[in-house]
Design a protein with these regions (language model features):
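N-terminal pre-Walker A segment at the start of P-loop NTPase domains
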Residues: 2-26
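Short acidic, glycine-rich loop/turn motifs
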Residues: 21, 92-96, 128
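ABC ATPase nucleotide-binding domain
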Residues: 29-31
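Hydrophobic anchor at the beta1->P-loop junction of P-loop NTPases
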Residues: 38
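Conserved lysine of the Walker
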Residues: 46
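Conserved P-loop NTP-binding catalytic core
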Residues: 50-115
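Electropositive, glycine-dotted interaction segments
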Residues: 97-234
């Protein structure tokens, strides 16, 4: 985290975004900066890159499965180009100066169920620093089991009953037993996406409301005036 001004204290800069097998993105690793502008022709993957970041944010709210279902299910969102082999596997991840996170989603291996096409979380990993290394791992999940690293470097089982549609980021995070997961979860939940901000006459941003100091504009832009004034003052 960079803290050169009061506004910077609420920012957490991502350095890298990685996506594999999502829509038009077969395998992509993108370096990021404080302001990153993505350009390209229609169909080049700009929207897919943005959606992948939103899916990562949904992981912190246990909303990724529903989000993928709204897109037509995992089979509809997978890379469908030439050269696809092996099991269905959608991989997403990001890294910053303090934390990194990666998740692998696939299809369930279960018997009779009405939800047989729901994606399930196969593996997850959380690490400190910008690079995923065994020594940097602070938490990892495989199937229904998640473990976290204690202060002395030893591993401790945090859960053996994670449901396939629940992320360890949302389920295992704890201020005492898994503080790194808690910090990561809260920062992921603080991400904002403004692609659906309304501008019509009845838009939330056009309605009267009491303004308070607002360091981050809300998803719907309802606190636009307060956020603008906060920026002017800090």
């Amino acid at each position: 985290m960079r803290t050169s001004s009061p506004v910077d204290k609420v920012l957490w800069v991502l350095d890298t975004l990685a996506v594999a097998n999502y829509r038009s993105l077969r395998r992509l690793v993108v370096p990021l900066r404080r302001c990153t502008v993505v350009t390209g022709l229609n169909g080049s993957g700009k929207s897919s890159l943005y959606r992948s970041l939103r899916l990562l944010a949904d992981m912190a709210r246990n909303g990724a499965v529903n989000a993928l279902a709204r897109e037509g299910g995992l089979a509809s969102t997978m890379w469908a180009g030439p050269g696809r082999r092996g099991p269905v596997s959608l991989k997403l991840g990001f890294a910053g100066e303090e934390f990194g996170y990666a998740v692998d989603l696939g299809l369930p291996q279960v018997g009779k169920t009405a939800f047989g096409l729901d994606p399930e979380i196969k593996t997850e990993a959380v690490w400190t620093g910008p690079w995923l290394r065994p020594a940097a791992l602070t938490a990892e999940r495989s199937g229904s089991m998640a473990r976290v690293r204690d202060d002395d470097g030893s591993w401790r089982i945090a859960s053996t009953a994670l449901r396939p549609y629940d992320s360890m980021v949302s389920e295992v995070a704890d201020p005492r037993d898994a503080p790194e997961l808690l910090a990561l979860r809260e920062r992921m939940r603080s991400w904002r996406f403004y692609d659906h901000v309304r501008t019509d006459g009845a838009a939330p941003a056009r309605q009267a409301r009491i303004g308070t100091r607002t360091m981050v504009l809300n998803h719907d832009g309802a606190d636009l005036a307060a956020a603008w004034q906060t920026i002017a003052e800090v």
